[in-house]
Amino acid sequence: MRILPNISRATWFVGIFFVVNILLTACNQPSANSSAEPSPTETNSPVAQVTTDPYKDYKPRLNGKATVEMMVNGQPIIIEVDGENAPITAGNFVDLVEQGFYNGLTFHRVVDGFVAQGGDPKGDGTGGYVDKNTQRPRNIPLEIKVDPAVENAPETPVYSRALGNQAGFPVMLPHKTGAVAMARSQMPDSASSQFYFTLSDETGFLDGDYAVFGYVTQGMDVVLKIKQGDKIQSAKVITGQNNLEK
């Protein structure tokens, strides 16, 4: 699962549609036809069609916020995980942290000034979490919370649907320096364990297509020094454990 090929930063803005489509590359599932640009019927009011929460009983989920301490190169990175606006995405991450899943995994992809991506047990961008009890992969739905200021914005997140930045709908958890989000394949509901830190404010074109679930609150200097191959020495939940519902 890769969110960006080896292209220079200068090429990111050679057409947003082109770039976002490059971001959607296959992981451990076959590719599917997908476009980050909404169709004419979707552009008018894609969020108005959401009336119920199809994932209200999904677990694990984070009901509120939690704080995670991640150690990289001997230094701490503190992440505030937001289950208020991304309960399923945040719950998945916190659950994996509690299991010790990320300990020892590498950052297999780092693009200076853009993202540092890790969380793949295979270390090559093709892996994800497999439940130890069921021996089945866990994939979570794409989860985007639209800003309530938007007309007809639903109270719950929009699931399984890439809205795309081009739709013009501001999101509650935007991409900016220090955002933490899930990587995925071309399939909207393919995120598993791979996540990325954004290294620049010039990443807003990912809003609506990738699910941000938290932000770095301390240790951004550590994040900016991450190199490809660096390991997550440890990750632990230091506050908000009781907000995780399994």
Curated annotation (Swiss-Prot):
Alphabetized Pfam families for the sequence: Pro_isomerase
Keyword Isomerase: yes
GO molecular function annotations of the record: peptidyl-prolyl cis-trans isomerase activity
GO cellular component: outer membrane-bounded periplasmic space
Polar residues bias spans: 31-52
Entry keyword Signal: yes
Protein name: Probable peptidyl-prolyl cis-trans isomerase sll0227
